[in-house]
Amino acid sequence: MTPGHAALIAVVDDDEAVRDSLALLLRLHGFATREFASGEAFLEWAGTEPADCVLLDLRMATLSGLDVQAELARRRLGWPIVMLTAHGDVATTRAALKAGAFDFIEKPFDGEVLLQTIRAATQRSAERRTQAEREARFARDLERLTAREREVLGHVLAGRHNREIAVLLDISPRTIEVYKARIMDKLNVDRLPDLVRLALEMGLGRE
């Protein structure tokens, strides 16, 4: 979901009446939908558009919801999945949640509960997309660092002070300060603690 665009929900259910009622409910509440009568049809489409949530029937005639979930994981499509389950289908529901499903809704579903769950799932999707964009931007910014700047950054993340880094690199502490300023400028941060926090969040500096 991007600003000004409705969140896109993929509805996957082999029961036409259920599929149509779900799509209608979602569209009436501002969501865009794509409907699929089978797991195979959905998987053929998956990846052609970025879905914000997948509403997935657990038990279908051919590919099951668990099968579809496993294939999405194999393709690294991290869309939040809300499983539609029959009442009492506890063991399979537990398996879906253990495999990473966002939540489940029992049939016959309560419209308001379903909408609340979908909104929470699309919020998760938006957060993941924002994080992915931050990571991509950081990776691009990191490419701008020189080899020496990367070396200095590594020492900073290891907790070393200017004098220690200066001795290790055989340069002056003042030069270390210059390198730090350049690094912060290239990585778009204003303070050293913010630089350290950002780098650690992005996976740098870990043993």
Q: Across the structure, where does each feature detected by a protein language model lie?
A:
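Basic, Lys/Arg-enriched C-terminal extension of HTH/homeodomain DNA-binding domains
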Residues: 181-207
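The feature encodes the CheY-like receiver
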Residues: 19, 61, 85, 89
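Acidic catalytic/metal-coordinating carboxylates
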Residues: 37-38, 62-68
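C-terminal output helix
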Residues: 89-91, 105-118, 164
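Helix-turn-helix DNA-binding segment
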Residues: 136-174
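Active-site beta3 strand of CheY-like receiver
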Residues: 49-55
